[in-house]
Amino acid sequence: MPSLLRIVGLLLALLLILVATRRLRRRGSGSRVPAATILLIGLGLATVSVAPDLVRPIQDVLGLSGEPLGRLVTVLVISVALAYGALFYALGRADRANQRVSRLVRALSAAQVELVRTGGPLGGVLVCVPAFEEADNLPGVIAEIPSTVAGLPTHILVIDDGSADATSAVAAGLGAHVVRHPVNSGQGAALQTGYLVAERLGADIVVTLDADGQHDPAEIERLVGPIVRDEADFVVGSRRMGASDSDSRARDAGISVYTRLINLLGGTEISDVANGYRAIRASRLSEISFTEDQFHNPELLLGAARAGLRVLDVPVTIRRRASGESKKGTNLRYGVGFLRVMLKTWLR
């Protein structure tokens, strides 16, 4: 005669199956992954309740044979594994949906450049400045960008990442090309828009420069020079080789750890992997896969190494923000996000 535990298990299984079936029959209720997971757990619980010996092989593997509640614990372990599998599947679907939306935002924003494009390829150096509510800092940054670098003309592109202030108007008034995201999408998304614009305009070299005044535009030639001389395809500015006004020991320690990890995974010899002051040969951008709207540094660095770009770092200076507060969030959030993208890119 079935035990009370098996009877309770069967009743619970039937309840789960009923709930899952009703949810799966609803139309327009969003993702079906949660309901499908409940259904699988219910079917599994029903199977075990009717034929408990079916889980014995897994119970043996887990070392739970002979334990008083071994079979129940085994069922719980299987259920948790199914739930985690469904969770990762749902997260993957959400990530892919987010990437599709992000690509649409970037494409629509980059299309704005056609309104300002005249004649043939732009050539020269396109200085991409991602900006989110930096109307107060942009005038000083743009004023310091030289008109020529290493014998090449410079062009300024400000990517307004959905600012609520006058960032776009200020940038346009200072003579910069401006494209604007309709919503705040993240610095990585803004830079990807900049890369897309650079390819459409036919720029030779792309320089990325923060809008908060931390990067010294007078040092752009240090980044561009090695590419012009065909010594590198991708040049990274390094505060380790240069100077920094940072007063955060925790952040500095984290950068050191992640620099070692990136070099280990990518086979590079970079001394600063968290600096956004960089230059890259525009013709090589299409060889790197970009998917991250945030914490884009590891994706770019590992992608460049995987694509076989010649990577070089040069000394630069990191200054304090001219005004306002950093948009990068806390050190912990930044560190966790950086690690997540680094591992995700390496495993891709």
Identify what each model region corresponds to.
Residues 134-148:
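Short, well-formed alpha-helical segments that are part of the catalytic scaffolds
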Residues 160-168, 213:
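A conserved acidic beta->alpha catalytic loop
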Residues 30-36, 47-60, 64-83, 90, ...:
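Hydrophobic helical membrane-anchoring modules
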